[in-house]
């Protein structure tokens, strides 16, 4: 749900706390009075099969700018107060995010490490000058967040009224070019100029002989531990404002993570470094009032130590049906599932089930699925749903 930058990937969000304003429903803004029907009359004809991100983003942000302009003109004192109260309630992250986005926009989208050193290094006088000069632009970004959180809150309440709980996904690492890293450089392993001293990835495996070089900055877990991992506690609380359960992506990184030199071109030269482990989850459980509404994404290089960490905190792991068809001993097959587990047909890395069946599943896989389900597989997506139930 986070705001995306270059590449449009939710795994490279511009903030771990903010919402994506591109998800704001413009028709609802007409209902709320921040746009008019005439504003939407010039809606472009979008391709219904493929997303043209450039066209969609430019048009939608233009409409959000129009809504901000109208809000400033017509909002009542009560509405202005409601907006201000919401901003105050999110003061732990919103001012930094809004200023970060305003400066980035003012500088043509430059990453923060390319900004003048006084802005890059958050010189107080430079930040004050930028805040005053870009006040309207920063206000627009605060307004977009208010719209997102207001609409998402309605959606979440509607789902709750129907007995539906929402599951969200939290990447373990954040993007280097994010307000989080810019505002809290002390929490990450960075050089004096703000660039990473080492980056995240995973080692070589069957699927990639050079591993995966993700490039995210790594946490300085020793610094995070000094205040009981408060930044992470705030992050999970923010996630749980939006969803009911959080899937922790790359759970194994909390036990040990793959550290790669920042100048490496592949992940081959990395090494395993111990993560915060049980101390971290103990702190999170305390911060979340004794609860851990989390799912452990326990895929990849999973060791007994990772499994022990997951089980010690009673976190459900994942069972992915598309990965199940290598033989009868495969632990993803339904008869091996355990009560404390979440069944997925596939993950965000997989083709949707129908596409997988049509284009990726080989003859042996299809035969095994048919044998396992004792019949012809005419609708593989429904077959997978039944297996997961």
Give the ranges of each region predicted by the language model.
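Conserved alpha/beta catalytic core and glycan-binding cleft of carbohydrate-active enzymes
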Residues: 79-82, 86, 187, 203, ...
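The substrate-binding groove and active-site-proximal loops of carbohydrate-active enzymes
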Residues: 45-55, 132-147, 210-230, 265-274, ...
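Active-site neighborhood of glycoside hydrolase catalytic domains
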Residues: 141, 148-161, 225-315
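Acidic/aromatic-lined carbohydrate-recognition and catalytic surfaces
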Residues: 1-185
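A structural signal for short, well-ordered beta-strand segments and their strand-loop junctions
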Residues: 99, 165-168, 245-250, 295-298, ...
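Substrate-binding/active-site clefts of carbohydrate-active enzymes
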Residues: 165-230, 235-238, 242, 257-273
